[in-house]
A protein has these predicted regions:
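The feature captures the conserved acid-bearing segment of alpha/beta-hydrolase catalytic domains
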Residues: 179-222
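Active-site nucleophile loop of the alpha/beta-hydrolase fold
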Residues: 155-165
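The serine-hydrolase catalytic nucleophile loop
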Residues: 67-80
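An N-terminal hydrophobic leader/cap segment in hydrolases
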Residues: 1-41, 46, 50
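Conserved alpha/beta-hydrolase
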Residues: 82-98
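C-terminal catalytic histidine-bearing segment of alpha/beta-hydrolase fold enzymes
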Residues: 226-263
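Alpha/beta-hydrolase active-site loop
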Residues: 101-121
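Alpha/beta-hydrolase fold nucleophile elbow
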Residues: 123-134
Length: 263
């Protein structure tokens, strides 16, 4: 009964976390970057490595975006990382008609396989930053432990504090509670995963886009963990706007690859 209801609700939940589409928005060349597709198994997805020509790699970034089939839409928002001398790995998971349950289940499973593939490409001596947006932040949380001593830092942008609180904030006590119970009963909440990470600096960032209530961000801000810090971006500022918050994040990332200590 639970599974059949879950399959029904998955149609409603799909748009909460994912915006699948096949449109090509940007090419690496548009951003002045080199792009290389990594070979993967046919049922896993697509991995694209972005690099800045003639710049020696100082580290790598695995970027978990919040959709599927729209990898190229995220090239402009990650290109600045390449300017810092970082190799950026973007990926799309491959959806299948055979996928069952809620979208998050197949997302986590397939994301794990692609992260394994990406880590095979990164030299053991090179540091890796995990960065995720919305449900991509959960993917980053689930996979950062795979990098072990390579993990330089973790950035969680517009990350739900818990599945239940996110659903309740958006849908009220009735439907929200039912959906949260079915959606993520087999997964730990983001705040639980954050509390288990001890030796990796974490930056939780937030910008009000109407998708995630600020109450989720404020709950993280009340969390007293020594490796946790926060940046709130102005609500109306475009994604590529250079402001003091963006400069602060840039400096944090540079420090991630200089030292393992937090500010």
């Amino acid at each position: 009964m639970k599974k059949s209801f879950a399959n029904y609700l998955s149609v409603l939940v799909e748009d909460l976390f994912f915006s699948p589409e096949d449109q090509v928005y940007w090419s690496p060349e548009h951003a002045g970057l080199n792009g290389q597709k990594l070979p993967t198994l046919s049922d896993e997805g697509t991995v694209l490595r972005l690099t800045k020509p003639n710049i020696e790699a100082k580290g790598s970034v695995i970027y978990f975006h919040d959709g599927s089939k729209n990898l190229t839409a995220h090239i402009p928002e990650t290109a600045w990382l390449c300017e810092l001398g970082l190799e950026v790995y973007l990926f799309d998971i491959l959806e299948s008609e055979d996928d069952k349950g809620f979208p998050i289940e197949s997302y986590i499973r397939k994301t794990g396989k692609l992260v394994d593939r990406i880590l095979q490409e990164i030299p053991q001596e090179q540091k890796v930053l995990f960065s995720g947006n919305f449900i991509g932040a959960y993917g980053a949380l689930e996979n950062v432990s795979k990098a072990s001593e390579q993990a330089a830092g973790l950035i969680l942008h517009n990350c739900p504090y818990s599945f239940r609180s996110y659903m309740l904030a958006n849908y009220g006590p009735g439907l929200g509670q039912a959906m949260s119970a079915l959606l993520a009963s087999d997964y730990q909440d983001p705040y639980v995963l954050v509390s288990e990470i001890k030796n990796v600096p974490i930056v939780v960032t937030y910008q009000n886009t109407g998708r995630l209530p600020i109450s989720e961000f404020n709950k993280f801000r009340k969390t007293e963990l020594p490796n946790l810090s926060y940046i709130e971006f102005p609500a109306k500022a475009p994604a590529q706007t250079v402001n003091k918050e963006a400069e602060e994040l840039r400096e944090r990332i540079i420090k991630f690859f200089d030292t393992r200590t937090t500010s």
